């Protein structure tokens, strides 16, 4: 049965997209009620506790800044207590202090509950502090997948003028004139 047709499976998955969506004119309290009704494992005590971490204004969430909308998404999604958390550009739009705080909350959830977190990001430096395993996708194809330590120790970017020498495993190649990367 596809995930989309299985409510028991869907409620175990939390997803925060780069471009978060909220119902038109929905307030944080409206979304709080919605999440509480949809997710049977919604943790009301955690939701109240996270209000300290995410001091959000009142009013329509769509009027919040991108960073505030992202904070609202983390507040709601973490309170739903998913087993798997899928994050697309999770800290995009957040200031540096909030970036650290959000990732700290996610890592605490991993440590306390064993949550599996999948992160899609273009900012690899940001992931070094929170990931233990990485994969590189290019146009939907997995180019490389290994532990972060192995990735850092054995993968390099090489630029040469002229043709690339034979015998080197190449994950991705681009060419500009005689410059191969």
PLM feature spans:
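ABC nucleotide-binding domain signature
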Residues: 13-17, 135
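ABC ATPase NBD Q-loop/coupling interface
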Residues: 1-8
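ABC transporter nucleotide-binding domain
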Residues: 101-181
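ABC-family P-loop ATPase nucleotide-binding domains
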Residues: 17-73
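Helix N-cap at the start of a conserved alpha-helix in ABC-type nucleotide-binding domains
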Residues: 96-98
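Conserved catalytic motifs of ABC-family nucleotide-binding domains
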Residues: 81
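Catalytic Walker B motif of ABC-type/P-loop ATPase nucleotide-binding domains
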Residues: 85-89
């Amino acid at each position: 049965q596809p995930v989309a047709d299985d409510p028991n499976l869907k409620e175990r998955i939390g997803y925060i997209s780069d471009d978060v969506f909220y119902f038109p004119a929905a307030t944080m309290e409206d979304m709080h009620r919605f999440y509480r009704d949809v997710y049977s494992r919604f943790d009301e005590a955690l939701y109240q506790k996270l209000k300290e971490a995410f001091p959000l204004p009142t009013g329509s969430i769509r009027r919040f800044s991108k960073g505030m909308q992202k904070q609202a998404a983390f507040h709601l999604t973490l309170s739903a207590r998913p087993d798997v958390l899928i994050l697309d550009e999770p800290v995009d739009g957040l200031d540096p202090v909030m970036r650290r705080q959000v990732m700290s909350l996610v890592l605490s959830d991993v440590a306390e509950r064993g949550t599996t977190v999948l992160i899609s990001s273009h900012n690899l430096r940001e992931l070094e502090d929170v990931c233990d395993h990485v994969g590189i996708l290019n146009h939907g194809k997995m180019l490389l997948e290994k532990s972060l330590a192995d990735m850092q120790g054995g993968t390099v970017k090489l630029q040469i003028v002229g043709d690339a020498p034979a015998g080197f495993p190449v994950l991705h190649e681009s060419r500009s004139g005689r410059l191969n990367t």
